[in-house]
Amino acid sequence: MKFVKPRPTGKGPEDWFNGDVWFDVIHAGTEPSRLRANMVRFAPGARTAWHHHAVGQTLHVVAGIALIGTRDGTVLEAHPGETVTCPPGEEHWHGATADRFMEHLALWEGTAPDDGQPETTWLEHVTDEQYDSPRTRNH
């Protein structure tokens, strides 16, 4: 067993996020594990850029309301205690509603060292029109 000291909170880079986003690395995976886990906090209206993960991603909402959008125009609302999974290669974005902070636990796997592909591929920023699309509550 090993106790891991917390790292300093990081600010989300502008290339990857619109608005103010802060994250704490909870787990960065040590071989053979490739598990990654971050606690991510979004200011009202903040969101990721479009991106996808080679091995998929799971988002567990802790506080606020999360918005998760996909290329087909779907924007899901997820509330505290709810979990959303994004399959490998699915282009998506996630963020907070315009009027509240949102916090989620983001879980994903890194790629194998000999795989040659990035674990996350970052794309263009989400437009206001995409962000403001009608939302769906899925139960």
Place the predicted regions along the sequence by residue.
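A short, N-terminal "cap"/entry segment at the start of jelly-roll beta-barrel domains
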Residues: 1-34, 119-139
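Conserved short histidine dyad/triad with adjacent acidic residue
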Residues: 22, 36-53, 88
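Conserved strand-loop elements at the edges of beta-sheets that form or border functional pockets
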Residues: 28, 52, 60, 78-80, ...
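Short, charged/polar surface micro-motifs in flexible loops or helix N-caps
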Residues: 31-33, 42-46, 65-67, 73, ...
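Short, conserved beta-strand element in jelly-roll/cupin
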Residues: 39-43, 52-68, 107-110
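Short beta-strand His + acidic residue motifs that chelate non-heme Fe in jelly-roll/DSBH
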Residues: 48-50, 68-69, 86, 91-98
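A short hydrophobic beta-strand segment most commonly corresponding to one strand
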Residues: 58, 85, 99-121
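Short acidic-glycine-tyrosine-enriched beta hairpin
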Residues: 72-89
